[in-house]
Regions:
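Intrinsically disordered, low-complexity terminal tails and linkers in eukaryotic proteins, enriched
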Residues: 42-86, 108-176
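Bacterial Sec-dependent N-terminal signal peptides
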Residues: 1-44
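Mature extracytoplasmic domains of secretory-pathway proteins
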Residues: 91-93, 97-109
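Short, surface-exposed beta-strand/loop "edge" segments at domain boundaries and coil↔beta transitions
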Residues: 11, 98-99, 149-152
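Short coil/turn motifs at helix boundaries and re-entrant loops, enriched in small/polar
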Residues: 15, 94, 146
Length: 176
């Protein structure tokens, strides 16, 4: 089947007007597809930059996302060991943590772009966090606001299944 028949008369007329060979048509089609993919990828990166909690351009206020899992505590990272993933920059406390993150970034990224999980679940708002107040559940990192006598991790624990479900829904709405 020729490209003209596969894509319809409008496309066929464009190819015919341009007097392209079959190989040129294939190259033209592939370049168009690649351009579309690059535009989509850039949009996704821009969306992450817009919605992730990156004060001073750094995620989790510079804390090492891998250390939450390996040391079960918040450990300050360093610009010496930094990497960017889809437009978001992370700091690490060691070269090995940086390498571990690069192997599986989605495994270590905090949920809800690093915003307070409780606030995202309660009303879909982006509230800053205390990197030292966290919970790992189901292999995922959740961060919480903890200032001025308010520790939202305690509130989250009281109704975690409902808040978690609602936070997932609210976070998805930000990306559509």
């Amino acid at each position: 089947m020729s490209i003209e028949r596969q894509w319809g008369e409008e496309s066929a007329s464009i190819f015919t007007l341009l007097k392209l060979t079959d190989m040129q048509k294939i190259v033209f089609t592939l370049l168009g597809s690649l351009l579309g993919f690059l535009v989509f990828a850039q949009d996704a990166t821009d969306l992450r930059k817009k919605h992730f909690n990156t004060g001073d351009g750094i995620a989790i206020r510079g804390y090492d996302p891998v250390a939450y899992f390996t040391q079960n505590k918040a450990v300050k990272g360093s610009s010496e060991w930094s990497t960017s993933y889809e437009g978001v920059t992370y700091y690490f406390s060691s070269a090995s943590d940086k390498e571990e993150f690069r192997k599986a970034p989605a495994r270590y990224e905090p949920q809800y772009g690093g915003w307070c999980a409780y606030a995202m679940g309660k009303d879909g708002t982006k509230v800053d966090v205390d990197p030292g107040t966290f919970k790992i559940t189901g292999g995922k990192l959740f961060l919480f606001y903890n200032q001025f006598f308010t520790n939202t991790l305690k509130s989250w624990n009281k109704d975690e299944p409902n808040l978690h479900r609602q936070a997932d829904n609210n976070w998805q709405k930000l990306f559509h």
